[in-house]
Amino acid sequence: MDYSIQERLENYLRAINFKNPRWIPCRVSLMPATWRKYRGKLEDIVLSHPVIFPDYREGSIDFDAIKDPGYRKGGFTDSWGCVWENIEEGLDGMVVKFPLDDWGKLDSYIPPDPIVQEERGGTPDWDKIRESLKERRSQGKLATGGLPHGSMYMRLFYLRGFENLMIDIATDDPRLEKLISMVLDYNIKFINKWLELGVDLMYFGDDLGNQDRLPISPEKFRKYLKPCYKKMFGLCREKNVYVYLHSDGHIIEIIDDLIECGVNILNPQVRANTVEGLVKNAKGKVCIDLDLDRQLFPFATPEEIRRHIKDAVEKLNSPEGGLMLIAECEPDVPLENIETICSVLEEVGGPSV
């Protein structure tokens, strides 16, 4: 089968638009900590699966390099003034100090400017980014932009603290509207910059669910968050830019809302939402980039992994398309299981973009 760059892009777009893709686009995401642990043995697996890793070249990964400060052991303060702490090199940390934990700090608080401040340090080089997008397009690749993970809902509790935000929402604290507007304005400015540069797809990530339920009721989601996503995603759709939304956690009750807001590709977790829940609430309505069960991968036998992937494909795929697969492998996943994941994905699908 032809897996050229042009064919991969055409197939990816066919999957998004339910126009009979030739194969299911599949990806395997390897965390920095996973590379640090397995090193050359992991690279051997990657090199033996060029269908899943079509652009990887031997030696192109520095096993010890951690570019994102959020993935380095220790602490740092982001552009919003949120203090992060990380106990595991190569995995993401968490916010431990919240600049707006007291409402009394809100009036004097000045949010960052995304045009001149990167969220995790540094100044964005927009000219370089513009040229990179042009180069990707000239190569027949997808020109992709995006906001940092956790840019709307999660940023609210990064600023207030999770418990405080839950109380704010439960009690309909009037000050919440000002906080939401501030974060939304930041995001709108960021999105408009990407749209000005010219992108084909915008990536958004916000973990809207807990393990087995929403953290807030669907009604509260529709009151406080849905209008934000509708505005953010609507800007993209007006420019014919695809909207990709990643969300960890259980989101079944709000999938229709997210589609209404303009999501083209939804990246939900299979364990939190179940295959059956996604068949009922998402199949045929939106392209599903299914996050395979990362909580299964560390402990399963290769045969259990095979059955898991095959079952998801059997129930969620259709000839029209609308399905992609992604497997994220943390450092607790045995090499044998990573090999199995890659092999089975090659059996059921082909490369992504």
Protein language model annotation of sequence segments:
Residues 66-118, 138-142:
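A contiguous, low-structure linker/loop signature
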Residues 26, 51-58, 77-85:
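Secondary-structure transition motif
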Residues 1-36, 86, 110-353:
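Active-site loop segments of alpha/beta catalytic cores
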Residues 35-69:
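Segments that shape or occlude catalytic/ligand-binding pockets
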Residues 40-44, 71-76, 304-308:
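Short, surface-exposed amphipathic charged segments that create phosphate/polyanion-binding patches used
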Residues 5, 41-47, 106-109:
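Generic hydrophobic, helix-prone segments enriched in Leu/Val/Ile
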